[in-house]
Amino acid sequence: VDYAHTGNALENALSMLQEIIPGKVSVVFGCGGDRDRGKRSEMTRVSQTLANRCWATTDNPRSEVQEQIFDDMREGVTDPSRIDFVVDRRRAIELALKNAEPGDCVLIAGKGHEPFQEFGDTVVPFDDRKVASELLELMKLGGRF
């Protein structure tokens, strides 16, 4: 889990992981609403360049409609077969973890330490670290999501 929420930060994190991970590197990432729309396609392009598999999802859409954020992000798609757009962030994390194999790494980027998501004026509890831990524990116990 990393706070990488710019193209440069995402590039640094993914480049480092590609150097040290023996398997595939996947990334779950999103772009915040009411922020620089220009960085959205760049984050997608960086993800597609440096990760083997990508899941684009929500990351504090705030007052923006998530589909508009996704439309901006889609402008950076270079290989549609290696990226899925999943509105539900928990589901995106779940899919990334389910698709990982021993030796692989899943980077969950963008929110880092933040324990919430912002949807309009509503703040919803959501912590990537806790969600990933819960899902990994279910996997360890043989549970289904």
Regions picked out by a protein language model, each given a short descriptive name:
Residues 1-145:
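ATP-dependent carboxylate-amine ligase
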